[in-house]
């Protein structure tokens, strides 16, 4: 039987290696690519079929949600499992909205990743019950009226801004023009009703975006 092909995408080599070792418990899985470069993944997808992509929501040059749309344009049947160490409430909710097949917090037991892969490849989705309950909680309801007004691109830029990157550095990372980044920055401040980087940092901490 043909092995199930898997791509692992994460910015940290040690995490990519750890996931690969974890998945070796299932001899039917074949890791065909490990990378943090979305362009390499796109090139691979254009020439070979892939069954599953396991990827961190935070990737150099893009965000996972934007990249998911790109993936589906190339291979509509590929399944996607998101990983993140950031706010489970916020990112798991967006993962569901984006059409991902699963979400696992990096703060959880690593075996959750293996279990999620097994579930997804069996035709199910994997969003742990505690995650779904967290999304439905009052905290997330409060969150939804504010953070969710931002687009995925704006969330990515917000996180770069509060980490201290300049407009030019953000533009270089996301392959955008300075003008486009400035426009996104203005939209972020306008949508959130904020006026300074200090307020933006406090906001990001409040909603666990950093």
From Swiss-Prot:
Compartments where found: Cytoplasm
Keywords from the named record: Cytoplasm, DNA-binding, Phosphoprotein, Transcription, Transcription regulation, Two-component regulatory system
Protein name, as recorded: Fimbriae Z protein
SUPFAM superfamilies, per the entry: C-terminal effector domain of the bipartite response regulators, CheY-like
PTM sites of type 4-aspartylphosphate: 56
Domain of life: Bacteria
Record's GO cellular component terms: cytoplasm
One GO term of the biological process aspect: regulation of DNA-templated transcription
Domain Response regulatory: 5-121
Residue span, HTH luxR-type domain: 143-208
Primary location recorded for the protein, binned into one broad class: cytoplasm
Organism encoding this protein: Escherichia coli (strain K12)
DNA-binding region in chain numbering: 167-186
A GO molecular-function descriptor: DNA binding
Keyword Transcription belongs to the record: yes
